[in-house]
Amino acid sequence: MTVLHSIDFFSSSSAPVAIEARAPQSAFPEHHHDFYEIVIVEEGAGVHVFNGNPYTLSRGCVCFVRDHDRHLFESTDDLFLTNVLFRAPDAFRFLSGVGHFLPRECDGVYPSHWRVNGQVLQQIKCLIACLEHAPKSDQVEDIALHESVFMQLLVKLWQGCQTQVGDDQEGRLYQLLDWLQNNYSEAVEWPELADRFALPLRTLHRQLKNKTGMTPQRYLTRLHLLQARHQLCYSDNSVTDIAYLCGFGDSNHFSTLFKREFSQSPRDLRSQL
């Protein structure tokens, strides 16, 4: 597995933060690094496999990667990212309490993926632009100013995650996307789901395609297939059981779709493990 080292990304040993833009981000194999990373999705779509679990990416996704996590990007489609790198939550000279504004693992569950709305993405652009420039010097006041901008960015993201579940259409669409991610095995009737999240059906179709680059049904099928691949790799369930657990009513149809998506059959994937 590829290991990325901080010495290759930070401008100096005293630099607390580094910015790496990916415009666009191409597919990248599984890797980990000796620093922390905040991945902010500005445009496009793709799949982020984080510690073996697949997450679909779209504009407004924010991913928090620790120094012991492993991840990869695949199926990227004009995926524009800004990566904010920092050494560790407790590695700043003048900041304390950074961990309060980061995801916290609870009972083995780490909420690594957040969402923020378009307004927050606009608000943080100037902060990211400031962080792109290394501190003017190694003087304590320049390091302190640089760290303070990072804290502003972190607080903006945290506030944005707390408020994105608002009652406007964008907030309700984000709630719907999160529901689909967490309930991939349930049967979906789009008119009922539109009513559940108080979205006109045509608006749901249009906005979901704008956010993900896919029709709702294509997006749902992709979610099912990604979860099925995860089950094939990390469970002992049979191919037939996995097909039903992941929302497919017919195992043969599942195998056909799986091969079309990943260029190999479910059984071929299993045989390679």
UniProtKB/Swiss-Prot annotation:
Keyword DNA-binding applies: yes
Record keywords, A-Z: Activator, Cytoplasm, DNA-binding, Repeat, Rhamnose metabolism, Transcription, Transcription regulation
Gene Ontology CC: cytoplasm
DNA-binding region per Swiss-Prot/TrEMBL record: 191-212, 239-262
Example of a GO biological process term: regulation of DNA-templated transcription
One GO MF term attached to the UniProt entry: DNA-binding transcription factor activity
Subcellular location as annotated: Cytoplasm
Positions bearing the site annotation: Interaction with sigma-70: 241, 250
PROSITE patterns per record: HTH_ARAC_FAMILY_2
Stored CDD domains: cupin_RhaR_RhaS-like_N
Primary localization class, coarse: cytoplasm
Residue ranges annotated for the HTH araC/xylS-type domain, each copy included: 174-272
Subunit architecture: Binds DNA as a dimer.
PANTHER family: HTH-TYPE TRANSCRIPTIONAL ACTIVATOR RHAS, HTH-TYPE TRANSCRIPTIONAL ACTIVATOR RHAS-RELATED
Role played: Activates expression of the rhaBAD and rhaT operons.
UniProt name for this protein: HTH-type transcriptional activator RhaS
Highest classification ranks of the organism: Bacteria, Pseudomonadati, Pseudomonadota, Gammaproteobacteria, Enterobacterales
Primary gene name: rhaS
